[in-house]
């Protein structure tokens, strides 16, 4: 209980005199694993300077324009937009939430939900020089650079969209100034080391 006695969250409340802001599409993922016959979920504590700072959250964030991949079948051969949209209950554009989920998960936790034909990533993280290259891509992503697909192409990967299950849709209450329309997903955490990025996330467990 001591961890929560001084629990504070950085809220930015709405102003009734301001015009309403549109909902921001977002995606987040529950990374779960079996450990000693119990289910564990990875969570990150957001830096106080960020929106909802101080809160413990799942890896995720807003949908980016770069998530709208034109030749998506190359990167997601086992889940297409029609099926993804059907699962979300929308007409089209559903698969973009899966892409955002995977990209944000990698940025915030270092977990890359992707594979190649040898299933190299799901069995363990890159080693040696490959690991250094992957870490450089992550740093560039955190700087706002659009390099996620470069990383995927670099190692000839496909995104594990078919292994990520959609579970819920939450909308931020109207009292908050910045409101999100967030799709929640769940995925088994692969054999990789999950950790916070040290920028938006300052702790993890």
Question: What are these regions, as identified by a protein language model?
Answer:
Residues 1-205:
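N-terminal leader/linker segments that precede catalytic domains of diphosphate-processing enzymes
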């Amino acid at each position: 209980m001591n961890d929560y006695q001084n629990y504070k969250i950085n809220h930015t409340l709405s102003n009734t005199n301001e015009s309403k802001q549109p909902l921001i599409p977002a995606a987040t993922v529950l990374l779960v694993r079996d450990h000693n016959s119990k289910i564990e979920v990875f969570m990150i504590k957001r830096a106080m300077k960020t929106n909802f700072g101080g809160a413990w959250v799942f890896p995720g964030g807003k949908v980016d324009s770069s998530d709208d991949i034109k030749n998506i079948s190359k990167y997601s051969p086992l889940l297409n937009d029609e099926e993804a949209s059907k699962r979300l209950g929308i007409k089209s554009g559903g698969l973009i939430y899966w892409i955002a989920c995977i990209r944000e998960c990698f940025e915030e936790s270092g977990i890359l939900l992707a594979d190649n034909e040898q299933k190299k990533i799901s069995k363990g993280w890159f080693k040696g020089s490959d690991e250094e290259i992957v870490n450089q891509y992550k740093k560039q992503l955190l700087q706002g650079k659009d390099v996620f697909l470069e990383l995927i192409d670099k190692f000839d990967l496909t995104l594990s969209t078919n292994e990520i299950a959609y579970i819920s849709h939450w909308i931020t209450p109207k009292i908050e100034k910045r409101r999100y329309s967030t799709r929640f997903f769940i995925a088994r955490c692969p054999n990789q080391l999950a950790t916070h990025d040290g920028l938006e996330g300052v702790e993890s467990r």
